[in-house]
Amino acid sequence: KMQEGKLDGVFLAAFIGQGKRDEASLQEAVQKVTGLIEGIRKQAELNKDLCGIAVTNQDFIRLKNEGKKAFFIGIENGYGIGKDLANIAKFKAMGVNYITLCHSYDNDICDSSTHTKKEWDGLSPFGEEVVKEMNRQGIMVDMSHASEKSFWDVIKLSKAPIICSHSSSMAMCKHDRNLTDEQLKALAQNGGVAQVCLLDRYINEDYKNASLTDA
């Protein structure tokens, strides 16, 4: 499909839904994400004549010149790092380029844009340490799914540009998952990027009639 679509590289996300936040559940989350990343790496190795893992833009260019597809790795939901900052370095060593801080519910890092109880009023104290460590490790901070307050907290704290990997425009479609004009402008000034999410309800409030023209 990548060949047919003339796509040279993709980000593959090790996704984990939000679960319980007791110690046992957090350890299980870390193990699940570790397994997903190992699975991506294994598939790349099994098909090394066709693709490879990319961590840098130089890796991407090398793979393209070799006629291979590039697989970048991300983690969707910081729940997957548990409460141990050392896991950030561990995942960096496994090739992770970005981590989405939360998903559809609040976690130990920050408040979500959906189903939120505004537990932290934005970024938590632990979340501040997570962002600092991600900056130190060279992992992009992804604020898709996070609450607007979480976004502002992170963009002020981060020493590196942040991203919103799959968020659309609030001005075009009112949904808590989308970004306001103020957020988009701040993101541009920060040197970061936002990628449009094509989920029907994020691009058309009458989502049952959404189409690609809405994007």
Kindly label every feature range from the protein language model.
Residues 1-118, 174-215:
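N-terminal hydrophobic targeting/anchoring segments and the immediately downstream early-domain regions
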Residues 94-148:
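Metal-dependent enolase-superfamily TIM-barrel catalytic cores that perform enediolate-based chemistry
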Residues 125-215:
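Catalytic pocket-lining loop regions of alpha/beta-barrel enzymes
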